[in-house]
Amino acid sequence: MKLPAAIKGATWLYDRVWLPIIPVLRRHRRLTDGFEQRLGNSLPRPADVWIQAASAGEAFLALELARTIQVRDRVSVLLSTHTKQGEEILRKHLPDGDSPAKQTPPEIAYFPLDRPSIMSSVVRAVGPRVMVLLETEIWPGHLLALKRSGCRILLLNGRLTPRSLTRYRLWPGLWRKLGPDEVLAVSPGDAGRFKTLFPDSVISTMPNMKFDRMAPPDSTASSTPAAELLPEAAPFIVLGSIRHEEERPTAAMISALLATVPGAVIGLFPRHLGRLGAWRTILARAGLRWRLRSELKHAVEAGAIILWDRFGELAGAYEAAEAAFIGGSLAPLGGQNFLEPLQYGIIPVIGPHWDNFKWVGPEVVAEGLLKVAANWQQAVDLLARAVAEKGSRAGVRAAARNYIDARRGGTRRACQSVLKYLKPVDRTEWGD
């Protein structure tokens, strides 16, 4: 691969910039695990396909893709991730006996630091025929090593925000030279942005692989802890995944909801439990009385606020709720997962900021499966209306299931693309 002199010089400089940075990173608590592997001192075994998943969410997608590929073809797979949480998910959900018969289980490793000399040694050791990058895993040292090795590069389930594109375009010539062979983006907008960044790559769209992972809730589950804490006939409103930047408007929402929906019980779920102390102060200053979830043994009184301080109970709260607001959306934070309430028959209400979930599609609003409020006041009106109307939960679940089912198939599409670069594919085995 012939590189322009400017890129060669920048690569040399980039490699040396890492020298003073590495000792600092070694002390970073999030990078301590697997640090020798990150340095390339513990090399993975060779693999035909290398799949990189940034963290926990992408780790599940990587597992699904690896399973599907190994069912279709006898190939060796390396799964890598940046985070300890991602590594734990990969190991937990892919035990030794999980691979198809006569297949070598995928190897799991931490993704190397992007120092070009480290990446070159790791790519030489692994020798992948196909590199799969999930969503937006774009690292110059990594891409350069892959290009020099002759490996085919695929970016699947691709997402690229306008803000990220602006940052990458500071040096458009670099990314044009390092572009993947093919990009499958999750929306036309993402595809257009990738085409701007990688004008020589093959760009198309695919269903988001995340739809393939969605499953209906267990209908045989027993009553949830949330249901046991509610007084009879009191409407229960969940405010889920509330972020730091939207605490004050959320407190205003709570006051307005208690005034608008008499007897309502509010379940307040901060996104980070480290904000519980701040919430105690905010609620006290607003003159609102609250109870900690961990201190409750019996049902609360009507009109109570439950400040949730336990992990793992948000889904059960949706099951018991009449209405739900999903945070990360009143401030420009990109939103949080609003799909889970739908699976329990609740049409979620969110604020105006949900860029991180636009991949779900604008049709989710058009089909009445998501209510988007312009501000916290409108969110209060929508939540109060949801409590008053008491729509059919079974109908919402069915509509949500149909919406999701119509958008499945991303994993299959991604697998087709990987196998296309490994060998000629008999397309009849995949169907139309």
Where are each of the predicted segments found?
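A transmembrane-helix-recognition feature enriched in membrane-embedded lipid enzymes
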Residues: 2-36
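C-terminal amphipathic helix plus adjacent low-complexity
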Residues: 4, 22, 255, 391-432
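Active-site and donor-binding regions of nucleotide-sugar-utilizing enzymes
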Residues: 25-42, 46-220, 238, 242-244, ...
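Acidic donor-binding loop of glycosyltransferase active sites
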Residues: 126-130, 301-333
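Catalytic binding pocket for nucleotide-activated donors in carbohydrate/polymer assembly enzymes
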Residues: 180, 319-402
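Conserved sugar-transfer catalytic core signal across GT-A, GT-B, and GT-C glycosyltransferases
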Residues: 142, 246, 313, 336-337, ...
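Donor-nucleotide binding loops and adjacent catalytic segments primarily
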Residues: 68, 73-74, 80-83, 87-89, ...
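Short acidic active-site motifs
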Residues: 118, 142, 275, 313, ...
